[in-house]
C-alpha cells in the first residue's frame, strides 16, 4: 500500500517497510547487521548520511526490525518537510536497491561488523538491559544467547548474506505511510 493522511501538520512523518521472516530464522543476524548499517543509531548510518548529512532533507531518520514468532517487519522512518518526502523515498530506495544489486566490499563489511559489535558491547554495560535481553532470549529460544554467542553469529555473516537481506527489503516490496 501507499497512503498519505493529511492532518494539516507542519512536518511529514513517513514510514516505509516490508514484511519478513520470524525471529527463529537464522538470517536474522544478517538482518540486524544490515539494518544497523542502513538506519541504526549513530551519525554514520547510511540513511542518516544520505538524507540528513548530505542533503539536509530530514529532521530524523532511523530503521528498525521487529521479529515475532511467525513473521517480522523491516521499517524505516523519517520526519521531513512535506516537499521532500518523495525525494527522500527515492534516495532511500536507490540506496537499498544498490545494496541488493551488488555485494559490499569485505573492508566495508568488517567496519559494519565492528561498529555493531561495539554497540552491543557498550549496551552490555547496562546490566538491566542485558538482563532483559537474556530473559527474552530464554523466553523465545529456551536458551540464553549472550553477547559472545551473538558476536560469533555476526562475525559469520557474509557479503552474500547481506545482499540476500537487501533483496528481501528491496523497494519493490515496500509499503508506505505518510502522515502530514
Model regions: which residues?
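M16/insulysin-pitrilysin zinc metalloprotease superfamily fold
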Residues: 41, 62, 66-123, 145
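Short beta-strand/turn micro-motifs at beta-sheet edges
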Residues: 1-5, 60-66
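C-terminal regions of mature proteins
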Residues: 113, 117-180
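His/Glu-based metal-binding/catalytic segments typifying zinc-dependent metallopeptidases
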Residues: 1-45
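Short beta-strand-to-loop capping motifs
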Residues: 18-20, 78-80, 180
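M16/MPP (pitrilysin/insulinase) zinc-metallopeptidase core fold and M16-derived inactive scaffolds
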Residues: 41-57, 68
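Buried hydrophobic packing residues in well-ordered domains
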Residues: 16, 32-34, 51, 76, ...
